[in-house]
């Protein structure tokens, strides 16, 4: 669709990067200035939880988004080099996401809170599992040992489509997480119209816009001819 409308990827990568910086700053301001800081070990267990949204947004979503857009950010770069960067960024995103999830479990366990009772937690485990499966498939099919060329050509559109599905599911999970945490805080007395509440809500809006820009950048053509073996999803 983006290609059919004559939309190029480059402007959306610029918008995505600006929104990524904004989202990263907002989540850091929230967790450090409003929530007291970050820690892996602390008497104040909330500091352990604060690591969770920071790593999930900056480490998991933003780095994963960079991996998705890398073919459009550097369209003239050697395809094998771009593919390696794509693979490494996704791997780092998965690791940081796993650490972020660990911090949520650690906070719950040390605070006497049950685990895996909410839709956010179910989707969180589901999405990072799908993300890992997607990464393994991509590694085996497109990197090492690598499938036959005709198999790669047939698998690529599905790899891209499934990757974007997992990405959108990840964004939805993040939005649910922000909503869930803000609801808990407001039920504990946080001002519904206070600065912190507005910051969290605006963070959610920025993340949504960021995700939209990334998806458009992923499906739109680059401003130069696509490298061999990679093209935007065809839309008939």
Swiss-Prot record:
Location(s), subcellular: Membrane
Membrane topology per record: Multi-pass membrane protein
Keyword Transmembrane appears in the UniProt entry: yes
UniProt: monodehydro-L-ascorbate radical binding residues: 116-125
Swiss-Prot/TrEMBL cofactor(s): heme b
Segments in the Extracellular topological domain: 33-53, 106-122, 175-196
Superkingdom of source: Eukaryota
Cytoplasmic topological intervals: 1-11, 75-84, 144-153, 218-236
UniProt EC number: 1.-.-.-
SMART domains: B561 (SM00665)
Cofactor comment text: Binds 2 heme b groups non-covalently.
Transmembrane segments: 12-32, 54-74, 85-105, 123-143, 154-174, 197-217
Mitochondrion found in the keyword field: no
Amino acids binding heme b 2: 86, 159
Entry keyword set: Electron transport, Heme, Iron, Membrane, Metal-binding, Oxidoreductase, Transmembrane, Transmembrane helix, Transport
Positions of L-ascorbate binding: 67-75
Gene Ontology MF annotations: metal ion binding; oxidoreductase activity
Chief place where the protein resides: membrane
Residues that coordinate or bind heme b 1: 52, 120
All residue ranges annotated as the Cytochrome b561 domain in the record: 15-219
CC annotations in GO: membrane
Enzyme class: oxidoreductase
Job description of the protein: Two-heme-containing cytochrome. Catalyzes ascorbate-dependent trans-membrane electron transfer by utilizing a concerted H(+)/e(-) transfer mechanism.
Protein name (Swiss-Prot/TrEMBL): Probable ascorbate-specific transmembrane electron transporter 2
Organism: Oryza sativa subsp. japonica (Rice)
Organism classification: Eukaryota, Viridiplantae, Streptophyta, Embryophyta, Tracheophyta
